[in-house]
Amino acid sequence: MEIFNDLSRKLVFPIDYPSQRRVAKLTDIILGSGTLVSCLLGFYAGSLSLTLYAFAAAYGLALLLVVPAYGKYRQQKLAWVGSAAATTKDL
């Protein structure tokens, strides 16, 4: 189990902005609920193609909601550390 935790920490790239974290959560919610709804819909209808079309619609919805809002990813600016030259200049 420890190997999987180490591997997941190495494969996940850090999220820089808090807005990116919110968008990643929104994407996970849309795709997760879309997967659940499409599986249930396809199961009750007995159609694999309906399952795939419903998931494609959820994927398209996620793309429409997340991709065009690139400016919203940078609403909350990060506080960068000052340069080392500015701190050692006073010595």
UniProtKB/Swiss-Prot annotation:
Q: Which residues lie on this side of the membrane: Cytoplasmic?
A: 1-28, 72-91
| Recorded topology in the membrane | Multi-pass membrane protein
Keyword list (alphabetical) reads:
Endoplasmic reticulum, Membrane, Transmembrane, Transmembrane helix
What GO CC annotations are associated with the protein?
signal peptidase complex
> What name appears for this protein in its UniProt entry?
Signal peptidase complex subunit 1
- Protein task: Component of the signal peptidase complex (SPC) which catalyzes the cleavage of N-terminal signal sequences from nascent proteins as they are translocated into the lumen of the endoplasmic reticulum. Dispensable for SPC enzymatic activity.
The family classification in the record reads: Belongs to the SPCS1 family.
One GO biological process this protein is involved in is: signal peptide processing
Membrane-spanning ranges:
29-48, 52-71
What is annotated about its quaternary structure and interactions?
Component of the signal peptidase complex (SPC) composed of a catalytic subunit SEC11 and three accessory subunits SPC1, SPC2 and SPC3. The complex induces a local thinning of the ER membrane which is used to measure the length of the signal peptide (SP) h-region of protein substrates. This ensures the selectivity of the complex towards h-regions shorter than 18-20 amino acids. SPC associates with the translocon complex.
Q: What is its subcellular localisation?
A: Endoplasmic reticulum membrane
What InterPro entries does this protein's entry cite? Answer: Spc1/SPCS1
Q: Which residues lie on this side of the membrane: Lumenal?
A: 49-51
| Keyword Transmembrane helix carried by entry | yes
Please name the gene that encodes this protein: SPC1
